[in-house]
Amino acid sequence: AMSNKSDKPNKSDEIIKIRSAKKMRDLMANYYLEAMTAKQNNKKVAWITSGGPVEPLVAMDIIPIYPENHGAMIGASKMGEDFCAKAEDMGYSMDLCSYARSDIGCAVVKGGPIGGLPEPDMLICCNNICGTVMKWYEIQARFFNVPLFILDTPICHTGYTPEIAEYVKTQLNEYISFLEKVTGNKFDYDRLIEVGKLSLEGQHLWQKVLSVTAHKPAPMSAFDAFFFLAFIVTLRGTK
């Protein structure tokens, strides 16, 4: 029997590229270029976990770098197997997170899709993202011989309490003192207010972007959302 279906592709099946993707790639390229040339420009580089408070770094003009993002880039470039094998040769179990193994191996080999990350002047680890990051960052702090700050965030099993707020506030003050000590500069609280406002505005706008996916058909996919997530993680608090 003959089919009544047309051989022409359905317009609704066409993949429409998001125009802002190119601009994002350009901005991210500039971000990595600035990080790679930080030492020449007398700037400090901090490796920070994706859930860590980046705003104090931005306020102090410290360039934040995200090894987790780098792990994703290594995986997307099909280079993870070699770096993971290097980490395993160093004694790290193949059961560990592949992002961690990729980053540990890459730091030794100094390769990868962008030629390795710029060496850190400090490491900032916040355990609200996962438990692996604490040991991962301890390993890298020893390898690069740089100071490490760990921010411990309690798990809110029964809700947010004043005790939790005070506990985290105390650590944030310690975090600021740590940054002052490493950089030798006084912290600019007025600048932090500006950065905080931009960060909050960015988070609200990102929520609006995500909310449009409730529309049918959705204007962007889950893969698009992961791709554009780089902005709200990496450049939060900037404009």
Task: Identify what each model region corresponds to.
Residues 44-45, 122:
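Short, Asp-centered acidic motifs that coordinate Mg2+ and/or phosphate
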Residues 106-108, 114-208, 212:
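Internal, well-ordered alpha/beta segment that forms a basic, Gly-enriched binding/recognition surface
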Residues 5-44, 169, 173-239:
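A charged, amphipathic alpha-helical module
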